[in-house]
Design a protein with these regions (language model features):
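Active-site-proximal, well-structured secondary-structure segments within enzyme catalytic domains
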Residues: 136-145, 149, 157, 175-218
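C-terminal motif of bacterial Sec signal peptides marking the signal peptidase cleavage site
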Residues: 2-5
Length: 218
């Protein structure tokens, strides 16, 4: 009888490993091609700066986020995780990473979409911003070159002040995005988005704060 029970438990564990492997395989079939398209769309948007390219990039990111926002899939992952029966070390690690990825997206899909759209709008503004110094319109690379090589104090000041003007263009959008992200994080049981980001990337907020305090005291 005891042997039968042990054998049954072993089969149950093996089944849970199998269930998770199948979950990962199904997820990869959806995510891998979409991730490739998303990365290419983002690259094209960053290069062209065009409205339509940023819109396409946002759409792919929304599609990707909705995969990880799927409530049924998250319930399956949660069941697998809480079973404690994924015994393979690599699978267990994959389970932790995927669980955190899904958890961070378990919010209202409409709000998720709004955040992605706003984030994309901010990125577009940053991407297309040009600092005007005199009659010159400078790209980020040109600004970086001046700031890292020039010894002309006046020129350095003019370039730096011109570059800072991007702040006023994105300030309101950033404040709005911060508020939306914090509300989303609170709805998932976190204090704010900062805490959620750290914990879901497996970092301890207290330890991070302690580290920065130590750096400040150096």
């Amino acid at each position: 009888f005891l042997f039968t029970m042990c054998k049954g438990d072993k089969n149950k564990k093996e089944d849970m490993n199998k269930v998770f492997k199948e979950f990962v395989a199904n997820l990869e079939a959806k995510v891998i091609p979409l991730h490739k398209e998303s990365a290419l769309a983002y690259f094209n948007a960053a290069i062209s700066g065009k409205e339509e390219d940023f819109a396409k990039s946002a759409e792919f990111e929304i599609q990707m986020s909705k995969i990880f926002a799927n409530k049924e899939d998250f319930a399956t992952l949660k069941k697998i995780k809480e079973s404690g029966q994924v015994t393979d070390e690599l699978l267990a690690r994959q389970l932790d990473v995927l669980y955190n990825a899904y958890l961070g997206n378990q919010i209202d899909e409409k709000k998720l979409e709004e955040m992605i759209q706003l984030q994309t709008e901010i990125e577009k503004k940053y991407n297309n911003f040009r600092a005007i110094v005199g009659k010159d319109s400078l790209t980020d690379n040109q600004i970086e070159e001046v700031l890292s090589t020039s010894t002309d104090t006046r020129k350095l000041k003019d370039v730096w002040m011109a570059h800072k003007k991007i702040g006023s263009l994105v300030a309101d959008d950033i404040k709005k995005l911060v508020k939306m992200r914090n509300e989303a994080a609170v709805s998932l049981g976190f204090k704010n988005y900062h805490e959620m980001s750290l914990k879901l990337s497996e970092q301890d907020p207290t330890e991070i704060e302690k580290l920065f305090d130590e750096l400040d005291n150096l």
